[in-house]
Amino acid sequence: MVESAAFPGGYYRNTFEAPEESEGSGSSAQIDTEVTASENSSTPARKCIMLNSNDEDPYGVQRQVISLYNMSQSERKDLIYRLKLELEQTKIVLKNAELQRMNPAAVSSTSDRVGFSTGQKISSRVSNSKKPSDFAVGSGKKVRHQNGTSRGWNRGTSGKFESSKETMTSTPNITLMKQCDTLLRKLWSHPHSWVFQAPVDVVKLNIPDYLTTIKHPMDLGTVKKNLASGVYSSPHEFAADVRLTFTNAMTYNPPGHDVHIMGDILSKLFEARWKTIKKKLPPCSMQTLPAVTLEPNDERKAAISVPPAKKRKMASPVRESVPEPVKPLMTEVERHRLGRQLESLLDELPAHIIDFLKKHNSNGGEIAEDEIEIDIDVLSDEVLVTLRNLLDEYIQNKEAKQTNVEPCEIELINGSRPSNSSLQRGNEMADEYVDGNEPPISRSSSDSDSGSSEDQSDDAKPMVQGDSSKMPETANSEAQRDENTRIDDLFVGSQSTGALEQMDICSQQKLSSDESDGQHEGNILETPASSEKRYRAALLKNRFADIILKAREKPLPQNGIKGDPERLRKEREELVLQKKKEKARLQAEAEAAEDARRQAEAEAAAEAAAEAKRKRELEREAARQALLKMEKTVEINENSRFLEDLEMLSSSAPEQLPSSAEETSPERPLDALGSFNLRGSNPLEQLGLYMKQDDDEEEPEAPAVPKPDETSTERPLDALGSFKLGECNPLEQLGLYMKQDDGEEEEPEAPVVPKPNETSLERPVDAFGSFNLKGSNPLEQLGLYMKQDDDEEEPEAPAVPNLANDVEEGEID
């Protein structure tokens, strides 16, 4: 029994009831609000809605009127909280229903139950067996198609009525997503896809700079998970993530690296397959609904009596909202890669690409005809995607036109017959990976622009010798596929064990032929690899040795073909032996690379030590030279000081120097003629040198030197022939004396030299020829005496004065 109660202000409200099933949608609930009077009106004029317990909503939802007039504040808050909670739960149900409608394979159609706080439950499930009855609109009319058949309606995410045909519009999108899933499975089954099946483990692979270089990591495992969970709303998002996976691999690894080559091969394979899906994408157009007509409804009439202006108006059927296609996005890595590709092909671009670039150049029409200025960062994503497609088409056409590919004959392992690798079927192996620094050998097929027929033929080709039974074909295609399968079994069985070895042999043969041609021309091309790359390649081969050997294993016979058991046993033994040898070789290469690296590190350390030692020696030698230079500077300065002291002594006045002669007779004047002015002292004394006195030698008494006051000043002296020798003999002043002979018995007495005061002043002196020798013989004054005969009496030697500072002849210290 449904109770009715009026809201304050003339409003009536309905609560949620358990909804019944509706076609193509989940649970639905509504809140109907009727405005019967003005809220500002003071009169309590209200118009009630007469509801019968048996009457239901056209969608099977019962109504209940809640009276807010008698509710307390807490009850109102509780009601508001319940309504908000139920609204959130309804949104979740609608979201799940929409997700189920867009991707029914990912979301199951099982019932989803949402619990309400009132204890009621809403069961939403999709049922095609029961359709809702016709609903009344306005004055008893229902919506019908133009052809007379009734049409069902659903509630969409916006709460409006949408046609159930909307589920049919997503069928092409679902088909395209299935094709994307098929393409992903083909990439997943490729021999090179094992590198991209899981996210990059930075710690395990020891590459800490990976996240610095790659800002948006992506892998095929994540793409597969997103595709299964319905994350991608369009195939464009799927293609962007797949391209990002291979772009990251080729960006982080150098061009000669194994992972770079694998990513390039898979990227080309994906682009070739993606063109078929891209052609099937729907254009961006709005899909309109057919017009509807209103017909009278005799089965059900509304029991609502309200003025026409206040009636609940049914929203007109809204056109189905088609989601806008996701615009393709170009990452920074893809932009830089496209720029490098454009620069490499700038000299050979065709006319239509040049016109496209001129149309979208940065400066508009201001540039000359022979100039092209393109800023990759300024162009939009749509323009860059179009440019990339044009470049891809040009490159593929260019590769298709190249006919100078030399066939390489390879001898099979089982020795059956030689085969031509360029004539064999490529299947999914459009490009083969060649170990080392050589580029992969491309086996290009016909152009991929042939349409859907090429896709069907490619799908018909077996990838792992067992997928042909899944594709229903006509009788001719079945026979052709069986024949191709048998041919593939014959070739793959003999080639799978040594696929990479055969490619190595082929590359070596090509290198040998190139070297022979180069020797004739004098040009030999060499591509030496650095030791670091070799070491890294050896480590990778050793790390993934099991996977490499597993990829080279010979597959067992399939499709019911039985071989000779003895031959199979021998082949297995040979395979095990080859596996052991190959693993041992890879380990030996890794060890050799490790030894080479250690030796290089040791040599580098020794060289660094020698360089440090040489630097220390140079520093020591420089310090030694600086010390010697400093010592020489000190010695020069000291010598200059000695010279300055000597110059000062030699230029000093005689009054400042001590003199024994001045002490003897400081007041005696010296005549200017014939006198030796020695500044009152011995020149050796001026230099600080004095004669050393012997202790044993008797010092002779100094002769009495007449004082100047005792000399007669009145005695006339002849001016001619007189020798003024001063006080004593000049030789004696120099410390030179006559040596006495020891053989003489008796030295003659020296004549007594009269003193000046004893000389008679009245004695006449001849003016001519007289020698004024100051009272004595000048020879005697010089120390020369006449030798006396033995018979004669030897005169006594005169007393020779001896200065305190005089010594014997030749005794100078």
From Swiss-Prot:
The modification Phosphoserine is found at residue 507. Residues 1-43, 120-168, 432-488, 507-529, 580-619, 647-725, 739-763, 787-813 are annotated as: Disordered. InterPro entries: Bromodomain, Bromodomain-like_sf, Env_Response_Regulator, GTE_bromo, NET_dom, NET_sf. Residues 442-454 have a biased composition (Low complexity). The keyword Transcription applies. It comes from the Eukaryota. GO terms for cellular component: chloroplast; nucleus. Pfam families: BET, Bromodomain. Residues 320-402 form the NET domain. It is found in: Nucleus. Keywords: Bromodomain, Coiled coil, Nucleus, Phosphoprotein, Transcription, Transcription regulation. This is Transcription factor GTE8.
